[in-house]
Protein backbone atom coordinates (compact mmCIF):
# COMPACT_ATOMS: atom_id res chain seq x y z
CA UNK A 1 0.00 0.00 0.00
CA UNK A 2 1.20 3.55 -0.78
CA UNK A 3 -0.84 6.52 0.41
CA UNK A 4 -3.69 4.11 1.06
CA UNK A 5 -3.66 2.65 -2.45
CA UNK A 6 -2.63 -0.86 -3.47
CA UNK A 7 0.37 -0.62 -5.81
CA UNK A 8 1.30 -4.26 -6.29
CA UNK A 9 1.82 -7.70 -4.80
CA UNK A 10 4.99 -9.35 -3.51
CA UNK A 11 5.32 -13.12 -3.34
CA UNK A 12 8.01 -15.61 -2.32
CA UNK A 13 8.58 -18.57 -4.66
CA UNK A 14 10.60 -21.66 -3.81
CA UNK A 15 11.43 -24.84 -5.73
CA UNK A 16 10.13 -27.02 -2.90
CA UNK A 17 6.63 -26.83 -1.38
CA UNK A 18 6.67 -25.53 2.19
CA UNK A 19 4.51 -23.75 4.69
CA UNK A 20 4.43 -19.97 4.89
CA UNK A 21 6.16 -19.04 8.15
CA UNK A 22 6.48 -15.89 10.23
CA UNK A 23 9.98 -15.29 8.85
CA UNK A 24 8.56 -15.23 5.33
CA UNK A 25 5.91 -12.77 6.43
CA UNK A 26 8.50 -10.45 7.98
CA UNK A 27 10.62 -10.67 4.83
CA UNK A 28 7.67 -9.65 2.69
CA UNK A 29 6.92 -6.73 5.00
CA UNK A 30 10.52 -5.56 4.78
CA UNK A 31 10.52 -5.86 1.00
CA UNK A 32 7.22 -3.99 0.73
CA UNK A 33 8.56 -1.20 2.92
CA UNK A 34 11.66 -0.90 0.73
CA UNK A 35 9.56 -0.72 -2.44
CA UNK A 36 7.26 1.92 -0.95
CA UNK A 37 10.24 4.02 0.17
CA UNK A 38 11.76 3.82 -3.30
CA UNK A 39 8.48 4.80 -4.98
CA UNK A 40 8.07 7.71 -2.58
CA UNK A 41 11.61 8.90 -3.31
CA UNK A 42 11.00 8.76 -7.06
CA UNK A 43 7.70 10.60 -6.71
CA UNK A 44 9.24 13.34 -4.56
CA UNK A 45 12.07 13.80 -7.06
CA UNK A 46 9.59 14.49 -9.86
CA UNK A 47 7.09 16.67 -7.97
CA UNK A 48 7.28 20.41 -7.49
CA UNK A 49 7.39 20.88 -3.74
CA UNK A 50 5.36 24.08 -3.66
CA UNK A 51 2.54 23.24 -6.07
CA UNK A 52 2.51 19.41 -6.10
CA UNK A 53 2.49 19.49 -9.88
CA UNK A 54 5.01 17.49 -11.87
CA UNK A 55 8.31 19.37 -11.99
CA UNK A 56 10.59 19.97 -14.99
CA UNK A 57 12.54 16.76 -14.41
CA UNK A 58 9.37 14.70 -14.17
CA UNK A 59 7.83 16.37 -17.22
CA UNK A 60 10.89 15.80 -19.41
CA UNK A 61 10.94 12.11 -18.55
CA UNK A 62 7.22 11.54 -19.02
CA UNK A 63 6.95 13.70 -22.14
CA UNK A 64 9.78 11.88 -23.90
CA UNK A 65 8.07 8.53 -23.32
CA UNK A 66 4.64 9.81 -24.34
CA UNK A 67 5.89 11.50 -27.49
CA UNK A 68 7.74 8.35 -28.53
CA UNK A 69 4.46 6.44 -28.24
CA UNK A 70 2.69 9.15 -30.22
CA UNK A 71 5.20 8.83 -33.06
CA UNK A 72 4.95 5.03 -33.16
CA UNK A 73 1.16 5.02 -33.09
CA UNK A 74 0.56 8.21 -35.11
CA UNK A 75 -1.23 9.91 -32.22
CA UNK A 76 -1.43 13.72 -32.31
CA UNK A 77 0.10 15.74 -29.48
CA UNK A 78 -0.04 19.45 -28.67
CA UNK A 79 2.00 21.40 -26.14
CA UNK A 80 0.78 24.49 -24.30
CA UNK A 81 3.51 26.67 -22.77
CA UNK A 82 1.96 28.90 -20.09
CA UNK A 83 3.36 31.98 -18.37
CA UNK A 84 1.59 34.01 -15.68
CA UNK A 85 1.01 37.65 -16.55
CA UNK A 86 2.35 40.36 -14.23
CA UNK A 87 3.73 37.87 -11.73
CA UNK A 88 6.64 40.16 -10.88
CA UNK A 89 4.16 42.89 -9.94
CA UNK A 90 2.43 40.52 -7.51
CA UNK A 91 5.76 39.80 -5.84
CA UNK A 92 6.77 43.46 -5.78
CA UNK A 93 3.46 44.82 -4.48
CA UNK A 94 2.36 42.04 -2.13
CA UNK A 95 5.56 40.22 -1.20
CA UNK A 96 7.05 36.86 -2.13
CA UNK A 97 4.82 34.92 0.28
CA UNK A 98 1.78 36.22 -1.59
CA UNK A 99 3.52 35.45 -4.86
CA UNK A 100 3.92 31.85 -3.70
CA UNK A 101 0.22 31.72 -2.83
CA UNK A 102 -0.59 32.99 -6.32
CA UNK A 103 1.46 30.16 -7.83
CA UNK A 104 -0.29 27.60 -5.63
CA UNK A 105 -3.75 28.99 -6.48
CA UNK A 106 -2.96 28.97 -10.19
CA UNK A 107 -1.57 25.44 -9.98
CA UNK A 108 -4.71 24.19 -8.23
CA UNK A 109 -6.82 25.65 -11.02
CA UNK A 110 -4.55 24.01 -13.60
CA UNK A 111 -4.69 20.63 -11.89
CA UNK A 112 -8.49 20.47 -12.12
CA UNK A 113 -9.00 22.07 -15.54
CA UNK A 114 -7.59 19.34 -17.77
CA UNK A 115 -8.13 15.66 -18.50
CA UNK A 116 -6.36 13.05 -16.42
CA UNK A 117 -4.49 12.03 -19.58
CA UNK A 118 -3.04 15.54 -20.01
CA UNK A 119 0.38 16.10 -18.45
CA UNK A 120 0.38 19.30 -16.37
CA UNK A 121 3.70 20.52 -14.98
CA UNK A 122 5.47 23.51 -13.49
CA UNK A 123 8.78 24.08 -15.24
CA UNK A 124 9.90 26.65 -12.70
CA UNK A 125 9.10 30.20 -11.63
CA UNK A 126 5.80 31.20 -13.24
CA UNK A 127 6.18 28.89 -16.24
CA UNK A 128 3.89 25.89 -16.72
CA UNK A 129 3.14 23.40 -19.50
CA UNK A 130 0.30 21.12 -20.52
CA UNK A 131 0.90 18.24 -22.93
CA UNK A 132 -2.28 17.16 -24.75
CA UNK A 133 -2.34 13.81 -26.56
CA UNK A 134 -4.91 11.94 -28.60
CA UNK A 135 -6.92 15.04 -29.40
CA UNK A 136 -7.05 17.85 -31.93
CA UNK A 137 -5.30 21.20 -31.88
CA UNK A 138 -8.73 22.81 -31.78
CA UNK A 139 -9.63 20.89 -28.63
CA UNK A 140 -6.43 22.10 -26.98
CA UNK A 141 -7.21 25.69 -28.01
CA UNK A 142 -10.78 25.43 -26.73
CA UNK A 143 -9.58 23.95 -23.44
CA UNK A 144 -7.15 26.84 -22.92
CA UNK A 145 -9.90 29.38 -23.64
CA UNK A 146 -12.20 27.60 -21.19
CA UNK A 147 -9.47 27.59 -18.56
CA UNK A 148 -9.00 31.33 -19.04
CA UNK A 149 -12.72 31.82 -18.40
CA UNK A 150 -12.55 29.69 -15.24
CA UNK A 151 -9.67 31.82 -14.00
CA UNK A 152 -11.61 35.01 -14.70
CA UNK A 153 -14.48 33.73 -12.56
CA UNK A 154 -12.06 32.88 -9.74
CA UNK A 155 -10.71 36.43 -9.93
CA UNK A 156 -14.15 37.80 -9.02
CA UNK A 157 -13.86 36.63 -5.42
CA UNK A 158 -14.19 39.70 -3.16
CA UNK A 159 -11.16 38.76 -1.06
CA UNK A 160 -8.86 38.77 -4.08
CA UNK A 161 -5.98 41.25 -3.94
CA UNK A 162 -5.09 40.84 -7.61
CA UNK A 163 -6.21 39.06 -10.75
CA UNK A 164 -4.47 36.04 -12.24
CA UNK A 165 -4.17 35.71 -16.00
CA UNK A 166 -1.76 34.02 -18.37
CA UNK A 167 -0.30 33.99 -21.84
CA UNK A 168 0.30 30.76 -23.73
CA UNK A 169 1.72 29.30 -26.90
CA UNK A 170 0.39 26.16 -28.59
CA UNK A 171 2.50 23.89 -30.78
CA UNK A 172 1.56 20.66 -32.54
CA UNK A 173 4.17 17.94 -32.19
CA UNK A 174 6.22 16.95 -35.22
CA UNK A 175 9.18 14.70 -34.48
CA UNK A 176 10.98 15.85 -37.63
CA UNK A 177 10.70 19.53 -36.69
CA UNK A 178 11.35 18.90 -32.99
CA UNK A 179 13.75 15.96 -32.64
CA UNK A 180 14.34 16.82 -28.97
CA UNK A 181 11.80 17.76 -26.30
CA UNK A 182 13.83 20.94 -25.70
CA UNK A 183 13.12 22.05 -29.29
CA UNK A 184 9.40 21.46 -28.74
CA UNK A 185 9.45 23.51 -25.53
CA UNK A 186 11.47 26.30 -27.15
CA UNK A 187 8.98 26.74 -29.97
CA UNK A 188 6.01 26.78 -27.60
CA UNK A 189 7.85 29.28 -25.38
CA UNK A 190 8.48 31.53 -28.38
CA UNK A 191 4.80 31.52 -29.33
CA UNK A 192 3.85 32.23 -25.73
CA UNK A 193 6.16 35.24 -25.71
CA UNK A 194 4.62 36.55 -28.94
CA UNK A 195 1.19 36.14 -27.35
CA UNK A 196 2.30 38.06 -24.25
CA UNK A 197 3.77 40.91 -26.32
CA UNK A 198 0.59 41.20 -28.37
CA UNK A 199 -1.50 41.37 -25.17
CA UNK A 200 0.63 44.23 -23.85
CA UNK A 201 0.36 46.12 -27.14
CA UNK A 202 -3.44 45.90 -27.22
CA UNK A 203 -5.24 49.18 -26.40
CA UNK A 204 -6.71 49.21 -22.89
Predicted ranges, named:
Residues 1-14:
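Sensory-domain boundary capping and coupling elements
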Residues 10, 162-167:
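PAS and PAS-like sensory/regulatory domains
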Residues 13, 131-133:
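Short hydrophobic/aromatic beta-strand micro-patches
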Residues 20-37:
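Amphipathic alpha-helical "output/dimerization" segments
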Residues 38-45, 60, 198, 202:
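Amphipathic coiled-coil signal-coupling helices
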Residues 40-55, 68:
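Amphipathic HAMP/coiled-coil signal-transducing linker helices
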Residues 56-78, 85-115, 121-125, 129-130, ...:
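Conserved long alpha-helical elements within nucleotide-processing catalytic cores of c-di-GMP signaling
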Residues 137, 141-148, 152, 158, ...:
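Catalytic-core segments of nucleotide cyclases and related cyclic-nucleotide turnover enzymes
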Amino acid sequence: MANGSRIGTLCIIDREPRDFCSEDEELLKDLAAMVEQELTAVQLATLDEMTNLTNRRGFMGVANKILSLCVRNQIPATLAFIDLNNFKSINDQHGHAEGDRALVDFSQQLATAFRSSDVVARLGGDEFVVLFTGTSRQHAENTMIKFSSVLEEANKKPEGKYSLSFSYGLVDYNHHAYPAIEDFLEQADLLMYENKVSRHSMPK
